[in-house]
Design a protein with these regions (language model features):
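Juxtamembrane helix-capping/reentrant segments at transmembrane boundaries
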Residues: 42-46
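Short extracytoplasmic/periplasmic juxtamembrane "stem" segments immediately C-terminal to an N-terminal membrane anchor
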Residues: 78-95, 253-267
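A generic, lipid-embedded transmembrane alpha helix
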Residues: 47-64
Length: 270
């Protein structure tokens, strides 16, 4: 959707307001300004009829609200898992020391790329960073070098890293990749336009039903449409504001990742 190109909280609010104005005006014009619904003056619809499309619209909004909450919950879990995996990688000792130092540098490079590129105000986790991916690959390659050097006995002068520690690092790397993939998949929202178009169309049908039930009185119909469209605007706004956990209202803050990066830069890790 066009509003997704803007970062401000006002973008989805104004976009949904425009949707609802368009729905209300088009419904009013179709019902009261054309002959399509003129027969309802003499043969009106039963008032309970308007509840059917409205209930369907309410169910759709409930479904989309649930999806928005799940997105936020999954995004928060992914952030926790990502920071936890990085902390585990940093806290497991690697021998010889030069491998430990290079691993820390790769982690620092990964965090820097993730925070400046993927979490940036420009991308909002919508696309992956090639630098971050390269840092992950180099980090994993470094771990395998440690394992290979010990297995071949190439570093007899140094204490080899315990195989259990290497297994733990490899598992943490897998957890880190999975958490990053989940974060990026939640940030990519380009494929949901069809759902919004169907929601707008269902809202239009519900507004049309509200106007059609009041066909005999234009003023009453206009009042009902205004109230319904205002309610629809609030529903649309709430969903659009929270559907993406990395943009607009209540967006996640990568503070745990930033804290780890600051710790690495200050040299507190080995």
């Amino acid at each position: 959707m066009i509003y997704e190109s803007f970062n401000g909280v006002a973008a989805p609010i104004l976009a949904t307001f425009a949707w609802c104005i368009g729905i209300g005006l088009s419904s009013y014009c179709l019902v009261f300004k054309t002959r399509l619904f003129s027969h309802l003056i003499t043969s009106p619809l039963a008032p309970p009829f308007l509840a059917l499309p409205a209930i369907m619209f309410a169910f759709l909004m409930a479904f989309m609200s649930s999806e928005a909450w799940q997105n936020f919950s999954h995004a928060r879990t992914a952030l926790i898992n990502e920071s936890s995996a990085i902390s585990q990688i940093l806290n497991i000792p690697i021998q010889p020391p030069e491998f430990q130092k290079s691993s820390n540098l790769y982690v620092q490079s990964y965090l820097g790329s993730v925070l400046t590129d993927e979490w940036s105000a420009k991308h909002h986790n919508e696309s992956s960073s090639l630098e971050a991916q390269n840092s992950l690959d180099k980090l994993e390659s470094n771990v395998w070098k440690v394992s290979g050097a010990c297995n071949q006995g190439a570093n007899k002068s140094h204490t080899c890293t315990d195989p259990i520690a290497i297994s733990a690092i490899i598992k943490a790397l897998g957890d880190l990749r999975n958490a990053r993939t989940q974060r990026l998949s939640l940030g990519y929202q380009e494929g949901v336009d069809t759902k919004w178009f169907l929601g707008i169309f269902l809202g239009f049908i519900a507004a049309l039903a509200v106007a059609a039930v009041h066909r005999s009185n234009a003023k009453t119909g206009a009042t009902a449409l205004v109230l319904f469209c205002l309610s629809m605007w609030i529903s649309f706004s709430m969903v659009t504001l929270y559907i993406n956990p990395y943009k607009w209202a209540d967006r996640l803050d990568p503070a745990p990742l930033g804290l780890i990066l600051e710790t690495l830069k200050s040299g507190h890790n080995r």
